[in-house]
């Protein structure tokens, strides 16, 4: 079958031919319809330090997808041939304390689809049936293919009660923009997003944020004054991994504020911890999606009217995958969809 693989320990992704995966007793075989390119896939393409330490070569990459069930393991119940599914990209062990306690998103033995095991940038994918999620009929293939990153946004945004709160989102990448849209949709008062990439800030404006602030041109404190905010932000969603953005967030949080961190900062990032202590801030790390509460919330948000369509900016045939990666690497894109049909 056709697949996009990391074949060499150097920059690039290559189209290749690999054997179709075998279906285990507890697995589903999924015929891929559409996939989306993640920032992780770009890291793998660039062959950065993280990729060199993490990715075995060769490896079929990709973990954002929608497809159709075409094979079912003999022990699997609850799925039928023809079901349209996406799936959780974190494969968990099922036997550690967190897994047994219903906190599978915190499994210490997690392996990643397209990172530690073959991914979805292929004509067929095998995953445990436990990880598959049926897509409601009124959700499009395009939207279903971005459920994985949308789940990161939902998990981060819904970590805290947002109704009536003032929310700061730092980082207007696709996940940050979707998190801001979720916050606005569920009843936050002011949702302010910051970045220095004007293209992506414009995407955030299309998604309905209160203010999209280019911090290279505009002061966040001036924007807060313009909005009549006198006590700081109640909730911070840190999506950038950029130390200056996180320091600004700490400066502008209200006392007792709550921060959810999805962005991955440098290991040696320094902050003024007195602001965390004396403001009584609560900081929560976010990894992946809650299984599977986040997935049900994702579907419900879209079915209740949340419009994510502006975040999908580019669509290509899989044969034009290089154009898709070029768009992602340019920084002038939202989500990029690759069609396998």
Swiss-Prot record:
EC number: 1.1.1.103
Entry-linked Gene3D superfamilies: Medium-chain alcohol dehydrogenases, catalytic domain, NAD(P)-binding Rossmann-like Domain
Catalytic reactions on record: L-threonine + NAD(+) = (2S)-2-amino-3-oxobutanoate + NADH + H(+)
Pathway recorded for this protein: Amino-acid degradation; L-threonine degradation via oxydo-reductase pathway; glycine from L-threonine: step 1/2
Binding positions for NAD(+) per the UniProt entry: 175, 195, 200, 262-264, 286-287
The protein's role, per its UniProt record: Catalyzes the NAD(+)-dependent oxidation of L-threonine to 2-amino-3-ketobutyrate.
Cofactor: Zn(2+)
Entry keywords, A to Z: Cytoplasm, Metal-binding, NAD, Oxidoreductase, Zinc
Gene: tdh
Cofactor detail note: Binds 2 Zn(2+) ions per subunit.
Protein name (database record): L-threonine 3-dehydrogenase
SMART domains documented for this protein: PKS_ER (SM00829)
Positions bound to Zn(2+) 1: 38, 63-64
Residues forming the catalytic site: 40, 43
Primary residence: cytoplasm
Family in the record: Belongs to the zinc-containing alcohol dehydrogenase family.
Gene Ontology CC terms, in alphabetical order: cytoplasm
Source organism of the structure: Salmonella arizonae (strain ATCC BAA-731 / CDC346-86 / RSK2980)
InterPro entries documented for this protein: ADH-like_C, ADH-like_N, ADH_Zn_CS, GroES-like_sf, L-Threonine_3-DHase, NAD(P)-bd_dom_sf, PKS_ER, Zn_alcohol_dh
Subunit structure: Homotetramer.
Compartment annotation: Cytoplasm
Sequence positions that bind Zn(2+) 2: 93, 96, 99, 107
Site (Important for catalytic activity for the proton relay mechanism but does not participate directly in the coordination of zinc atom): 148
């Amino acid at each position: 079958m056709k697949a996009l693989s990391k074949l060499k320990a150097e920059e690039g992704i290559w189209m290749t031919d690999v054997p179709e995966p075998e279906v285990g007793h507890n697995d589903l075989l999924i015929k891929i319809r559409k996939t989306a390119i993640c920032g992780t896939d770009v890291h793998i393409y660039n062959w950065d330090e993280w990729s060199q330490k993490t990715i075995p070569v060769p490896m079929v990459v990709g973990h954002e997808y929608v497809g159709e069930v075409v094979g079912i393991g003999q022990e699997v119940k609850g799925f039928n041939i023809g079901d349209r599914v996406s799936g959780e990209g974190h494969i968990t062990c099922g036997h550690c304390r967190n897994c047994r306690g219903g906190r599978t998103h915190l499994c210490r033995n997690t392996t990643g689809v397209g990172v530690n095991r073959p991914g979805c940038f292929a004509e067929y994918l095998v995953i445990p049936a436990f990880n598959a999620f049926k897509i409601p009929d009124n959700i499009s293939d395009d939207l279903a293919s971005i459920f994985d990153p949308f789940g990161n946004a939902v998990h981060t945004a819904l970590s805290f009660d947002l109704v009536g709160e003032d929310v700061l989102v730092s980082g207007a990448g696709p996940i940050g923009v979707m998190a801001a849209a979720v916050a606005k949709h569920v009843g936050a008062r002011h949702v302010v997003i910051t970045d220095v990439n004007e293209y992506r800030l414009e995407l955030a404006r299309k998604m309905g944020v209160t203010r999209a602030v280019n911090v290279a041109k505009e002061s966040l404190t001036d924007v807060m004054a313009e909005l009549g905010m006198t006590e700081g932000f109640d909730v911070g969603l840190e999506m950038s991994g950029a130390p200056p953005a996180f320091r600004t967030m700490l400066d502008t949080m209200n006392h007792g504020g709550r921060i959810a961190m999805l962005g991955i900062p440098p290991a040696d990032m320094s902050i003024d911890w007195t602001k965390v202590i004396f403001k009584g801030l609560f900081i929560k790390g976010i990894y992946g999606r809650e299984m599977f509460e986040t997935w049900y919330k994702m579907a419900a948000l879209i079915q209740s009217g949340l419009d994510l369509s502006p975040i999908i900016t580019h669509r290509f045939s899989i044969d034009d995958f290089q154009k898709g990666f070029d768009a992602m690497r340019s920084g002038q894109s939202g989500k990029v969809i690759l069609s396998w049909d």
